């Protein structure tokens, strides 16, 4: 049985498969560059593990308080060394990226302090954390002030506006690397470094925190290499490599991370407690595999951009732009288009491939969200997935794929479902 026949058995027509192969022929140089970045980042992770003398004893499970958990301590040293920070907090007790960000913000902001977002409105779930949408226990409820500076029309930072917004009470600047549910470009590490340097010039003691979700290992450097006081992310995204079943991380200065540890557990306890519950082998191995897994997801995003751009759909980033995260936005023009695309991603899944994604009122969002994610880990967005709020401009956000081949299948099946619904047409 040939490869084309295998794809046909999974629901991809010969015409769609051949269209995909035409697109791929032009992407080989870009894929080679991605492989080189993955190789570099693989050696970076390996060096951090070797430096900290990772041993089989580090995989031992702990329960209860988790005192003297050698494996947990080594894991945090590995993260700190890999991301070039003074300290790290890497815990399964951090349930998601939003939780990690909430810990980092609430630990380092006190009543009367001001939080500034220089990239406009934050990701949807952070609106309630901050209090933009009123919520119990939000930062605003505790007396933290909030200000934001919108991006310029071309998606770049408004440096004049940022300079004017930074004042005596500005304590922390939160920078969102990835686009989230927006159609702006994601920021490169170089752009983030330029912003941080500018903010520090305006107010030398201001803290700069970067939401690093979806960006880890996409480039050879991280925001922590260009002056970020904290970088924050989720282990069921890039750094977990698809194996971490839960968790989040905060890497940064010793002072910032110490405060985060006290906020996560309790004052006086900090990093000394927190049992690993037998999860360390998955957290270590996932981190080791992450550079390669991210490279496959990145190839899938570039493939999706080129597949849909050639058919006339607006894609962000476009088919030739440089990449700074694994997310690919595709504007499909209608709710029907979003649902068809997501049906294709779900049909490509190893888990729950037979179910049909439908919009639902997801906690933390102000519009119904449709999600396709037949994943081994619930909510894992380093696994093949697609989602988006069902509202204008009806953009679906595609990401992940534990292997490049799985990402490729997902993109082709999404297109097949679009064609079957009469919502797209192949060229020629």
What are these regions (language model features)?
Residues 3-28, 35, 45-58, 66-69, ...:
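Conserved PLP-enzyme active-site core in the AAT-like
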Residues 78:
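Solvent-exposed, charged/polar functional surfaces in cytosolic regulatory/catalytic domains
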Residues 86-93, 351-353:
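Short, well-structured beta-strand/strand-turn elements
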Residues 309-427:
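Conserved C-terminal alpha-helix-loop-beta "cap" of PLP-dependent enzymes
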């Amino acid at each position: 049985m040939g490869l084309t026949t295998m794809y046909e058995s999974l629901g991809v027509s010969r015409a769609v498969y051949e269209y995909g192969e035409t697109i791929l022929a032009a992407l080989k140089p870009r894929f080679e560059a991605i492989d080189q970045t993955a190789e570099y980042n693989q050696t970076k992770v390996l060096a951090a593990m070797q430096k900290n003398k990772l041993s089989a004893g580090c995989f031992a499970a702990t329960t209860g308080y988790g005192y003297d958990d050698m494996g947990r301590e080594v894991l945090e040293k590995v993260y700190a060394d890999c991301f070039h920070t003074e300290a790290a907090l890497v815990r399964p007790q951090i349930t998601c990226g939003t939780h990690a960000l909430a810990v980092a913000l609430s630990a380092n902001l006190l009543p009367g302090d001001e939080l500034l977002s220089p990239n406009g409105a934050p990701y949807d779930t952070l609106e309630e954390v901050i209090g933009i949408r009123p919520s119990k226990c939000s930062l605003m409820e505790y007396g933290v002030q909030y200000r934001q500076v919108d991006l310029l029309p071309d998606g770049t930072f408004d440096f004049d506006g940022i300079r004017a917004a930074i004042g005596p009470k500005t304590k922390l600047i939160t920078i969102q690397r990835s686009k989230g549910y927006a159609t702006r470009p994601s920021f490169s590490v170089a752009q983030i470094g330029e912003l941080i340097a500018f903010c520090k010039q305006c107010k030398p003691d201001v803290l700069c925190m970067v939401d690093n979700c979806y960006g880890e290992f996409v480039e050879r450097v991280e925001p922590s290499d260009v002056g970020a006081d904290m970088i924050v992310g989720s282990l069921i995204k890039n750094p977990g490599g698809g194996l971490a079943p839960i968790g989040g991380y905060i890497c940064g200065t010793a002072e910032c991370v110490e405060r985060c540890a006290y906020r996560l557990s309790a004052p006086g306890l900090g990093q000394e407690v927190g049992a690993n519950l037998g999860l360390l082998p998955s957290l270590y191995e996932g981190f080791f595999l992450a550079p390669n897994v991210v490279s496959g997801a990145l190839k899938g995003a570039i493939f999706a951009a080129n597949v849909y751009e050639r058919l006339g759909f607006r894609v962000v980033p476009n088919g030739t732009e440089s990449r700074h995260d694994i997310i690919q936005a595709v504007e499909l023009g209608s709710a029907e288009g979003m649902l068809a695309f997501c049906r294709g991603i779900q049909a490509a899944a190893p888990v729950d491939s037979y179910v049909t994604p439908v919009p639902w009122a997801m906690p933390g969002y102000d519009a119904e969200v449709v999600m396709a994610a037949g994943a081994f880990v619930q909510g894992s967005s380093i696994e093949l997935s697609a989602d988006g709020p069902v509202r204008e401009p009806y953009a679906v956000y595609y990401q992940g794929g534990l292997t490049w081949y799985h990402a490729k299948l997902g993109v082709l099946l999404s297109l097949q479902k679009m064609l079957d619904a009469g919502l797209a047409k192949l060229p020629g």
